[in-house]
Every structure is written in structure tokens, then in C-alpha cells.
Amino acid sequence: MDKKAIFDSVSNMEEQIGELYQQLGDLKTNLGEMLEENNRLNLENEHLRRRLSLTDEATPEPKAEIEAEHGVMAPNRKEAMQQMIELGEGYDNLVQLYKEGFHVCNVHFGSPRGNDEDCLFCLSLLNKK
């Protein structure tokens, strides 16, 4: 091989590496978007499951309707209301998400944290408790 052919071959390889690097960047961006969407959908599913279980528990039976008319709350409904009032659960969920490597701040909520780096916005939110 002469020097020109070698130079052309190296230039061609450099172009291919550049294209592969661009494709890798695109894949990384798509993966980040999919992780954000997956996290958002998981949160939504969990919220909907809780809401469904609360509505199933709170569905009044004939006896419960009579109790509700007289101002006495049915035991299941009372428990459901207590669960809704419980504030620590939401905080615990945010802490768990942060530990799993996702932002919980209003600036970058749901997006993955790069290399598990700490986010000052997230930390200030979690330390407000």
C-alpha cells in the first residue's frame, strides 16, 4: 500500500468513527428520554393503583350509606382518609426516587441524575422536611 491509500483508509475510518459517535450520542439521548418517560409512567401507574384501591375500599355498602347519613364514618372510609392524610409517604417516595438516581426537584423532575451526582435543588427540597 502506498502512503495515499493508507491516508485515505485512515480518513475513511475516522469518518466512520465520527458517524458511530453521533449514533451513540443519539442513542444516549433516546435512552434518557425513555427513562424519563418510564419513570413518569411508573409514578402515574402507582398513583392510579393507590387511587383505585382507595375508591374500592371507600365504595359504600348499604349499611355504610346509613352510617354516612347519620354522620358516622365507615371504618374502611376512615382508613382511606387516614392514608390520604398521611404526609410522610410522599416524602418517602421522593427520597426513594432520588436514591434510585432521578431528580425530584421542580427544575429537572424525573430526569436521570448524571453519574449519581448530587443536585442542590433536589437536596434543598428533601431537607425542607
Curated annotation (Swiss-Prot):
Which cofactor names does the annotation list? Zn(2+)
GO cellular component term of the entry, any: nucleoid
Superkingdom of origin: Bacteria
- Residues at which Zn(2+) binds: 103, 105, 119, 122
Question: Where is it mostly found?
Answer: cytoplasm
Establish whether keyword Zinc is in the entry: yes
Where would you find this protein in the cell?
Cytoplasm, Nucleoid
Pfam families under this entry? YabA
- The signal peptide here is none
Q: Which UniProt keywords apply?
A: Cytoplasm, DNA replication, DNA replication inhibitor, Metal-binding, Zinc
Cofactor descriptive note: Binds 1 zinc ion per subunit.
Entry's Gene Ontology BP terms: DNA replication
Q: Does the record bear Zinc in its keywords?
A: yes
Q: How does it assemble?
A: Homotetramer. Interacts with both DnaA and DnaN, acting as a bridge between these two proteins.
Family of this protein: Belongs to the YabA family.
Function, as annotated, reads:
Involved in control of chromosome replication initiation. Inhibits the cooperative binding of DnaA to the oriC region, thus negatively regulating initiation of chromosome replication. Inhibits the ability of DnaA-ATP to form a helix on DNA; does not disassemble preformed DnaA-DNA helices. Decreases the residence time of DnaA on the chromosome at its binding sites (oriC, replication forks and promoter-binding sites). Tethers DnaA to the replication machinery via the DNA polymerase beta sliding clamp subunit (dnaN).
Listed name of the protein: Replication initiation control protein YabA
- UniProt organism field: Listeria monocytogenes serotype 4b (strain CLIP80459)
The gene is: yabA
